[in-house]
């Protein structure tokens, strides 16, 4: 069967890129992104175009949450054979090699030539026929996937064309109101691409484990420092820290985790986040009281013990529901 072209007209104005990051707890991060995507794509009578990108090439998972609903593919066609992010940037690398010194030191021009030579729509699939919701999966999961993912040289692509990733983001936001990037955890070149070069917004999910918040703080600091020190990257980066508790936390333990208690030797996450953002943005006064009163994710997300909203028959509007938690986040971040 011939694959029909996926045609997405340009949006009325540029969209925005939001990266979802967690130093650990990838399940919470991915489900938070998936739920956000469903709610955003439901806006304006389900006509808001949203693209999810699975950049966690080591442990990809968004394709499991969103089985393809793309009419270009035969039902029997194995999901393993569908191209995605990895194949797209393999093609970018090949184009850069073919260009040689074409464009010289004009990296913006080189990025334009590379991106115009690749049909990005071939790497994107529709995953919800009721909404304009799309996915660029991590890659084609054939026998060579693991080796190719390990071999992907994100630093090398950046060195060959520093404008490539920034231009890639701008390229996609001409067609999608929201581009949501599922970034792998830890620290790596891929993490730097996703948190420093691509986004307009960074949603950082963290758990009570101290290293979770420490890891997030390090990524935020490096991203903002880079943008402040590199002229071509000087654009705002809005940071939205998102606490994800643990099942069994009662009100007292949640408050202790949030506010801390010097007498018990507990440093709360709110004062640490407020100091982090004051230092990063160079502002004297900052309070997260109102924001953190509303934006808190359920502990079950950290264990991946809940279904994402797209898999549920209907959205639950209960005050303590998953839907309300994500809607509260989007009320601030989107």
Question: What does each model-identified segment do?
Answer:
Residues 57-170:
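P-loop/Walker-type NTP enzyme "switch/lid" segment
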Residues 160-281:
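Conserved catalytic-core segment of NTP-binding enzymes
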Residues 27, 39-41, 164-165, 183, ...:
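Catalytic cores of eukaryotic secretory-pathway lumenal/extracellular enzymes that build
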Residues 133-134, 177, 200, 294:
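Conserved acidic residues
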Residues 18-20, 51-55, 134-137, 238-245, ...:
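Extended hydrophobic secondary-structure segments that form protein cores and membrane-embedded regions
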Residues 33-37, 65-81, 85, 152, ...:
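Short secondary-structure boundary/capping segments
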Residues 1-7, 226-334:
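C-terminal lobe/tail of nucleotide-utilizing enzymes
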Residues 11-58, 64:
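Walker A/P-loop phosphate-binding motif and the immediately C-terminal alpha-helix
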């Amino acid at each position: 069967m011939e694959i029909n072209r996926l045609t997405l007209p340009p949006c009325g104005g540029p969209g925005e890129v939001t990266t979802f990051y967690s130093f650990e707890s990838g399940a919470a991060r991915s489900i938070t992104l998936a739920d956000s995507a469903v709610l955003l794509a439901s806006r304006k009578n389900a006509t808001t175009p949203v693209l999810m990108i699975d950049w966690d090439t080591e442990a990809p998972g968004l394709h499991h949450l969103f089985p393809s609903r793309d009419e270009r593919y035969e039902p029997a066609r194995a999901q393993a054979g569908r191209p995605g992010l990895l194949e797209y940037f393999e093609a970018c690398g090949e184009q850069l090699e073919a260009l040689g010194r074409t464009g010289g030191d004009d990296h913006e021009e080189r990025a334009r030539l590379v991106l115009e030579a690749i049909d990005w729509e071939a790497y994107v699939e529709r995953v919800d026929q009721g909404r304009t919701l799309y996915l660029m999966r991590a890659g084609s999961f054939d026998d060579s996937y693991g080796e190719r993912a390990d071999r992907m040289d994100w630093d090398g692509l950046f060195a060959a064309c520093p404008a490539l990733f920034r231009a890639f983001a701008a390229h996609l936001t001409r067609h999608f109101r929201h581009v949501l990037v599922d970034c792998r955890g830890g620290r790596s070149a891929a993490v730097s691409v996703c948190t420093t070069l691509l986004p307009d917004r960074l949603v950082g999910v963290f758990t009570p484990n101290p290293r979770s918040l420490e890891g997030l703080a390090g990524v935020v600091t490096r991203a903002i420092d880079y943008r402040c020190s590199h002229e071509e990257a000087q654009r705002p980066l809005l940071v939205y820290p998102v606490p994800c508790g643990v099942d069994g936390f009662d009100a007292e333990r949640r408050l202790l985790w949030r506010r801390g208690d010097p007498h018990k030797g507990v440093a709360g996450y709110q004062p640490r986040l407020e100091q982090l953002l004051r230092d990063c943005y160079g502002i004297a006064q900052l309070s997260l009281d109102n924001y953190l009163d509303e934006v808190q994710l359920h502990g079950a997300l950290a264990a991946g013990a809940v279904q994402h909203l797209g898999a549920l028959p209907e959205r639950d509007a209960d005050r303590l529901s998953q839907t309300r938690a994500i809607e509260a986040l989007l009320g601030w971040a989107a």
